Amino acid sequence: MDVAVLDPPAGRALTVDPSWRSFTSVQGGLVVGHLLAAAADLSGATPRAVTAHLLAGVEPAVEASVAATPDRVGTTGSVRATMSQHGRVAAVAQVLTLARPASPVAETAPVAVPPVSDGVPFALPRDLVPIADHTSIRALGPSRPLGGGTDPRLTAWVRIDGDLEPLVQLGVLLDALPPSLFAVRTTPAALPTVELTAHLAGPTPAGGAWVFVDQVTTWADGDIAVDDAELRAEDGSLVARARQTRRLLSR
């Protein structure tokens, strides 16, 4: 039963090119990225955390609307951002902002990441996910999507090619890899992202930068799978940590 909210708030118009499609809809990470950017534009502050619910697929090549409303302004702020299409809310996010640039991250121990050159070029199936035309992936470790392995983990260097705002690109990176559950499967399944929470650290990666993504399915049942991911820059510095809920549509 579709219970998406009708009469969404007015906002700026946006039409996403079909090349950013993943399966039948616009990639969820791109949607989250636009919500992050809308919150930053409204507040003039730095997004530090986001929780987004993806309520319906966003159709490419069809006009959508992005709107943002402040719930709190100040040094610590909170912004509600929505993307709507066909008169209903398709995605909603609550974005925590801080009115200063992100400071250096202090970790208990330095984290070493393998060089980009260690990665093996891996191409997503462009007929199913045209966003592959914008995505360069260098896979690391033994696991591959639909490889029938024993560990539900995917690790890779990822680079996004495309003229995207930095926060929009970051959203795409948060959702760039297939579901890690695919590493232990041999057949594909429809597992769209329905929720994504991320904590953002350090400066947003520059356009076209390589980002290390280590993603693992922490648990799954017959209806959902939960993936945790860590994103790092080439120097090992933390970019973001994310958790997303994927809905298994075969039930």
Label each residue range with its predicted role.
Residues 1-251:
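Terminal targeting signals and extreme-terminal segments of soluble enzymes
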